[in-house]
Each structure stands twice: as C-alpha cells, then as structure tokens.
Amino acid sequence: MSKKSKKSKENQKVDQLETSHKDGAGQPLTTRQGLKVNDTNNSLKAGPRGATLLEDFLLREKIHNFDHERIPERIVHARGSAAHGYFELYESMGKYSKAGIFNDTSRKTPVFVRFSTVAGSKGSTDLARDVRGFAVKFYTEEGTWDLVGNNMPVFFIQDAMKFPDLIHSVKPEPNNEIPQAASAHDTFYDFVSLTTETLHNHIWVMSDRGIPRSLRMMEGFGIHTFRLINEKGKAHFVKFHWKPTLGVHSVTWDEAVKISGADCDFHRRDLWEAIDSGQFPEWELGMQIIPEKDEHKFDFDLLDPTKLIPEEMVPVKIIGKMVLNRNPENFFAETEQVAFLPGNIVPGIDFTNDPLLQGRLFSYRDTQLSRLGSHNFHLIPINKPVTDVHNNQRDGHMQMEIPKGRTAYFPNTLGGGCPHMTSVDDGAFTSYQEKIDAKKIRARSDSFNDHFSQPALFYRSLSEWEKEHVISAYSFELGKCKEQSIVERMLWLISQIDKGLAKRVSENLGLDIPSKIEKPINQAIGADTKPSKNQPPKKKNYLESSSALSQSNTVFDSIATRQIACLASDGFNMSDFKKMKKALEKENAIVKIVAPHGGTIICDEDMEHPVDANIATTESVLFDAVLIPGGQNSIEALMEHAKFTKFVREAYKHCKAIAAMGEGSQLIDKIEVDAVREDDAILIDGTAKDFINAIAKHRNWNRMEKAAKIAV
C-alpha cells in the first residue's frame, strides 16, 4: 500500500474528496463536452491572416471560461493557506459535553484548517502586522462543526453591529485605495481612538503576536464563550484554545518588512513545505470550563468577546491533539472555496448570547451567497459533511444532486414520512433551554464597559523585550498617521493602559501626552444615550500578570523545521560542515548551503556539493540561524561579497544564533560590535549541542540594545 493511500484510510474526508479529483495525466485534451481538441494554439480564421470566425466554439469556450475563473475574494480573511489533518481526543469529556468528538477517544476526526490575515487582499503579504484567522472545520460523525477563531483570544469589537465600521476603517482608504494590508493610517486610528472597546485586541496586534514566525508557531482561540451540554442537559461555559507543540514564536518588525520583499508567500510556503516533508504541524486543544453558576463571579463579562479569562483564574485543560498531515490538491477548489460558518455546531455544543457571535451566525452564511454564487455551497466537495444528508431543501443555482421521489415536504405519507425527524435520544440537535427574562432593547451592558484593565494586564505580563517591541509598533503605526489630533487622542488612551508605555511612544513621536481629551471618551454610543453611559472606568488590577500571555514562557525545546543557512564557498571545511549538519538534521532542522553562485561548490576534500540558495536570490530573514564552516579559501570568497557580510550582520541584528568554526570567525568580526564573541548565541568553535540549544531559544533577546546599533 502506498504512503498516500495509507494516509487516506485515516481520513474519511480525504477519501470523499478523492471521488471529485480530476487527473489529466496521459489523457487527451477535450472541451467541456468531451470533444477531443486538435489545436488549442490557434483560433479559427478565414485564412492564416484573415478575420477570426464567430463560429469558433473552441475559442469561445476557452475564453469564456477564463473570463469567469475568478470569484469575489472574501471581504476579510482573503489571504489564506490551508491543510487537511485529523483530531484525536486524549480523554472523554462526557461529564461536560455529549458531542461525539469529545467522548470517543478511538476516533480520528478529519479536519480542514485555514489560516489567514484579516485586512489584506488575496495577493497581499503574509507578513502584515495583523490578526491571523485560525478556522477549523471538523467533519464529525454527527455533522460538521466549525470552530472559526483567530490567533488572539479577544476581538476588536463587542457587538457585530460595529463590524462593518471596523473593517471599513482598517481597509485601504476609499479615496485612493491606500494602504494595502496595513492598519497604520488615519481612518483606522480615528475609529480606534473613538471606540475604546478596541484597545485590548489592538495591543495584542501591536505585540509580537501580530507577526508570527510561522503559522505552525501561533496559538489559536475560539474567541467567544460557548456552551457545552452533557447528556443530562447540564451546561457549562467554555473557551477553546489551540496550543502549538512547537511553541509560540514571532519575527521582528524589521524582519517582517524585509520578508515581505524577499518572499511575500513566506507563511504559505513554510506550511506547505513542512507538511510536504513529513514535519506535520501539531496543536493541542484545550478548554477553559466554567460552571454556569460562576457566570458572574469575574470582574469582566464572559459574554464580552474583547475579554479573556486569565489561565490563573481558570486553567486550560488539554483534551486532544490536531495534526495537519496533507496539503490541498488544488488551492481554488479547497482553500478558496471552503466556507466556514460559526453556525455549524453539533449536539453537545451550543451558542451563548455573545453579541458578536450572534451577528457572525448570520454574516458568515450570508457572505457565501455572493462569494460562491449559490445557497448550494454546501455541495462543493470541501464543504460536504462526511455524514449522510437528507432533507426537503431543493433546487437553486448549481444544484449538484438528483433527489429521488415525489415528496419535498413534511409531514407526508407519499414518501413514507421520510426523511423523518429524530429524537434527541437518538442524536438530534436541540437548543439549550436558557431562561430569558428581559425587555427588548438596543443597548450595551454596563458589564462590558471596562476597556482598560485587560490591555493593562496584557502589557504588564510581557517580558522587557516584548514590551520594547510593543513600544516600537505603536511608534511606527501612529507615526504613519497624518492627523495629529488622532495621534494625541491615542496617546491619552494608551496612557490609561500604561503611563510608561505612553511616555516612551510619545517621546518617539515627539509629542506630549494630552492631559485630557474630548468627552465622551468612548463615542461608540447611541444618539440618545447619555454621554456618561458605556464609558470605560479607570483600570482595575485584579491580577498582576498572567504568564500565558507572554511568549517568553512558551516552548523552547525543539529546533524541528528551523531553517539554518550554511554560508560556504569553494574550499569550505567538510569536516566542520558534516559534523554540524548531521547533528542539526538529527533534530529535524533544515540545513541549506548559501553560496556566491548556484550549481555546486567544492569542499576542501575535493567533493562537489549542491548549492541550495544563491546569495543573489535569498536573504538572512528567511532563516532562523547561521552556520559558517571554516576553510580560508571559502571565507575569503565570502568576504569578497558584501551581501555575505550583510547576511551575518542582519542575523545578529535580529538576535539569531550564529555558529562559526575555524576561519569562519572572521565573518563574525565583520559584525563590528564590542564583545560580540561573548554573546550567548554567538558560538565560535562551539559544540553542536550548544548551537542547537541556542537555536531552540528562538532568539537571544538580551542583545537587543547592541543589535539596535547595527545598520543593515
């Protein structure tokens, strides 16, 4: 049995998709009607130089199809990458939920996961500073469940009514369609400065979470509070978390800008190549479970999507693992046409009254009609459930099935009463019977008003190097705004989060922090709402810090899939290279020779070695660490190329590990920083073990002050 067929047996969804695959290998070219084509290079003409004839149906079909190949891109999350995989449960959660996916540990539930940026268009860079979408489609035996989340646990806004305003503000400005995939402009900060509920998510975006090293190295969150329902009908509130086994790691802003120029498909390529090489990305699924009786015990509202529950208050219980082990066969058919709907749930999972979630339940289904062209988008192969589907919903554009029988209604006798309804005991879905005693009102709960405490908690929880990155991000973003009044309002709001943060940003901008701003502070209120209503109170300090919020507390135990650039030319020391390469690859790192030219280079033992990257076509920002084997001829050749010196200096600037052996240390000295050899992540004739440990730490952020002086 081939590796591919063995894999497919583990994944019911992939088996289903294979029935829709088309493979033209060894087949003749035909029209859409099956007519074999003799010439697809020339149109039908009245003579070789004559007019093209209208009767040329081959030309018309080919051009007609080309004219209609594209579909509208997603309004948000247009830029995406996806993969197939499976989810396995560690232990039964039947105490909390009757969902089969949370009870049966023998199942391998097929999943399709799409990662995305929010603001940019389909062709924008992967490395924009932005929230990342993290949407998981579970093809369960009880129906499809979509957990449509992000890589940040909180959202910008509290109510879906504000979503069009948010997106209109962050998208390119309508008068000139500038800037693309960027929040650093006036309309966005005009909105944020007047809508203070945005401040928590915004500081997450300003942190390193906004520019992840890899899609495989970021967390995922369900954002909303959902309900779990067990067999007895008892409910618990739940927040969903995805924890990457490789840890949570990011790049610097300088790297992100340069990666966007060197390889704007960096994240997409990284995900594809990792899966293609058998280094399958993994996340563990965790739950924060809260009894219904504890709904109001916190200093924040569980229904507020701009708030998180600190893990110190409610620990995350790890319940299972997701593995992505197969790339899509076709980007358009799968990644582009997949439709995620928060309204896709299964028995044992239910909604809450989160006002953002409630609006998403409508919006995600509604948008598919214009994007995919029909309400029958569930018949597109990637969207089809693996369970049998039988109902009385009929017809419409692009109906792909042929329903049998006379009846399309219920109740009926002519169809034997089928398809029949199912009792709850036999697996039918029923909504949770929540008691409701309220007046119909268009208003915001006062329990949603605290807009400063959690962003302050987030900032306090960061390490010093993370705080420096936040300061730089705010300084860059606000520095791009042209309206000083907007910037000053933002500075005042930041001062309510942390005065030290605001002071540093204001100094970088050359502006004073205003002592007061125009009231109401939060202007996202109704016309007849009292100006004092829905205003943020002064921040509370109900928790000094939360370790889970800082990337300095993530996993640092692996160099798997890390990209190591080996700088070498003719005459490089084979012994140095071979020894280090063997140790690195044993830990599943990827070592690539970067040389002054393509083709091959010859080592000091007169053996040829293929070059993986020509220095003219690559950059240091595409690698995690640098290896410089000895060999005087090799080092002299490298130092003749200014770009190799730049490569090493830039790797140092971005706080990466660099190992040099023998004469390779001469390139280290080109960094031209005092005591550079005393750096913990600069290894001169060090051991492979020491180099591996330095790479596993991701970066040596202790060198940031010195690194800032490096000009590259």
Tell where the protein language model's regions lie, with residue ranges.
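Glycine/threonine-rich flexible loop motifs
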Residues: 633-644
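Active-site-adjacent core segments of small-molecule enzymes
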Residues: 2-574, 578-581, 585-586, 590, ...
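Short, conserved catalytic or adaptor-binding loops enriched in Gly and charged residues
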Residues: 672-677
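Short glycine-/acidic-enriched loop or helix-start segments at secondary-structure transitions
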Residues: 576, 637-638, 668-671
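Glycine-rich nucleotide phosphate-binding loop and flanking beta-alpha elements
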Residues: 572, 633-635, 665-667
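A charged, well-structured terminal subsegment
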Residues: 678-712
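Short amphipathic alpha-helix with an adjacent loop that forms part of the alpha/beta core around
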Residues: 615-622
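Catalytic nucleophile loop
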Residues: 483, 595, 625-630, 644-670
